[in-house]
Amino acid sequence: MLESPGEAPATRETAAARAKGGLLVVGSFVALLFAIELLNTVLLHSLNGVFGLRPRSADGILDVFTFPLLHANLNHVLSNALPLIIFGFLVFLSGLRVFLTAVACSWLGSGLAVWLIGAGGVTVGSSGLVFGLFAFLLVRGFFNRSWWQILLSVVLFLAYGSILFGIIPNIAGYVSWQAHLGGAAGGVLAAVVLRARASRR
């Protein structure tokens, strides 16, 4: 099929709009995390005890929806901020629906894993989202059979692949490997779901 003269500029405009939208959405989310951490610091991190995730606690299941928004301290937020911006932006380039699906699956996967198999105590932090978005970016190209997405996954793996050790219990140390594992599983699930939807079209 021949392309009309207006199609290429329209494609470039769409890509530019997605890039701007990605920076706005992901940047706003990370800014929200810092704002919450500032408030939490003023409150002596009392929010963690209220909205942090407590494994296998019947009254704490709803905390699945809040625990990624909280962190132990400023350094904890900083450690998650940059990968969230990078991975979130790259996912958003595929569109808002793809981004929301990947985030939702990573968020729920991370939370449910902690709630079901967490070691105890209170878990907070958005690292499960980091692992989920990273896993999504690693596998989606193979489901979509997209060479550029596969190439991107190889580059990301070479640059950030070492973080995958965070899903191994004995290596993860004091961080929640359950959140990392659940988030990564959610990211893979998102790639499967989105591929299935595309196949039905």
Describe the role of every protein-language-model region:
Residues L2-R201:
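A detector for small-residue-rich transmembrane helices and their helix-helix packing motifs
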